[in-house]
């Protein structure tokens, strides 16, 4: 079973049912699946290939849920970044994971000024917020709006879906792998 199977099953069983409701934005499972599919397609358009790492630095929201499903849908590996990390730790997680794309919300956009020159593998930064993205970032909504739907990539249940970092109590944080 792949992570995308959860969304596909929800659309089959209750497509018109509520999938998410956050700060006045509501969507049913059919709408949610459409956005997840198009975000996955948009990530592929940025060059994300199976196994590529896509990091997420944002607070919980309906959009976080979208990219939690869209990254493995695209064949990528999601790397959630702890929102309480200091800039040097964020740099370590991004570089150690080899993240090529970073999805970042308004709450953390300012931290990029402190870390930008230290990121080794990052190619694209996607602003997940309302309004125009800061300079040098792509718009999350434009990425979705400009992409066509796509079927989930058949990566197989034993393929890597996520990379979660430990607390680092015995040294630097280490990535722990989660398969589909």
Residue ranges and their predicted role:
Residues 8-9, 45-46, 73-142:
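Structural core segment of the AMP-binding/adenylate-forming
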Residues 59, 83, 178:
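Short, conserved catalytic or interaction motifs in soluble domains
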Residues 54, 71, 102, 160, ...:
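Conserved S/T- and glycine-rich ATP-binding loop of Class I adenylate-forming
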Residues 15-16, 147-165, 172:
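Conserved pre-ATP/AMP-binding loop-to-beta segment of ANL
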Residues 28-30, 161-180:
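Conserved AMP-binding A3 loop
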Residues 18-61, 65-69, 86-91, 139-142:
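Conserved AMP-binding/adenylate-forming core of the ANL superfamily
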Residues 1-18:
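A short N-terminal helical cap/helix-turn-helix that marks the beginning
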Residues 52, 76, 158-159:
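Surface-exposed loop/turn positions
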């Amino acid at each position: 079973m792949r992570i995308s199977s959860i969304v596909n099953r929800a659309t089959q069983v209750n497509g018109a049912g509520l999938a998410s409701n956050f700060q006045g934005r509501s969507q049913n499972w059919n709408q949610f699946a459409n956005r997840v599919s198009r975000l996955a397609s948009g990530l592929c358009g940025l060059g994300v290939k199976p196994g590529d790492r896509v990091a997420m630095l944002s607070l919980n929201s309906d959009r976080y849920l979208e990219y939690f499903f869209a990254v493995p849908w695209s064949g990528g590996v999601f790397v959630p970044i702890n929102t309480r990390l200091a800039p040097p730790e964020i740099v370590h997680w991004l570089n150690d994971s080899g993240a090529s794309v970073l999805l970042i919300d308004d709450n953390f956009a300012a931290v990029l000024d402190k870390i930008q020159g230290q990121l080794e593998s990052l190619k694209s930064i996607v602003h997940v917020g309302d309004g125009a993205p800061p300079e040098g970032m792509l718009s999350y909504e434009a990425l979705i709006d400009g992409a066509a739907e796509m079927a989930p990539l058949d990566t197989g249940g034993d393929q890597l879906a996520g990379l979660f970092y430990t607390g680092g109590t015995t040294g630097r944080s280490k990535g722990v792998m989660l398969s589909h």
